[in-house]
Amino acid sequence: MPTIQQLVRKGRRDKIGKVKTAALKGSPQRRGVCTRVYTTTPKKPNSALRKVARVKLTSQVEVTAYIPGEGHNLQEHSMVLVRGGRVKDLPGVRYKIIRGSLDTQGVKNRKQARSRYGAKKEKS
């Protein structure tokens, strides 16, 4: 434990918390290029083939990003926009690809929560 004199001289240092989306370097989103598009299986009680992509960001960091929604048009060398947000049942996936921006198309026939999936309003 420090003495009062030591605290007067140095003071206390604040602890620096760990950032959950370090690869974004403080930005809300980052652009990147898909290096690999593949499917992976989730953690124990769940069962599916989740669509994910390895993305090399403009911050020179390569991350694994989830592709939300049903169906996608992504392939290698596609330009994508990546945001933070983990997928609970996929270990190591801490980023999501934004649908409807750059090379990523929106989800077809989406009626609800359209803005999250880049789907345009249907003409009635």
UniProtKB/Swiss-Prot annotation:
Entries under InterPro entries matching the protein: NA-bd_OB-fold, Ribosomal_uS12, Ribosomal_uS12_bac
Keyword tRNA-binding applies: yes
Statement: the UniProt record of this protein carries the keyword Ribosomal protein: yes
One annotated GO molecular function: tRNA binding
Pfam families found in the cross-reference section: Ribosom_S12_S23
3-methylthioaspartic acid sites (modified residues): 89
Record family assignment: Belongs to the universal ribosomal protein uS12 family.
Subunit and partners: Part of the 30S ribosomal subunit. Contacts proteins S8 and S17. May interact with IF1 in the 30S initiation complex.
Its biological purpose: With S4 and S5 plays an important role in translational accuracy.
Protein name (record): Small ribosomal subunit protein uS12
Species of the source: Mycobacterium marinum (strain ATCC BAA-535 / M)
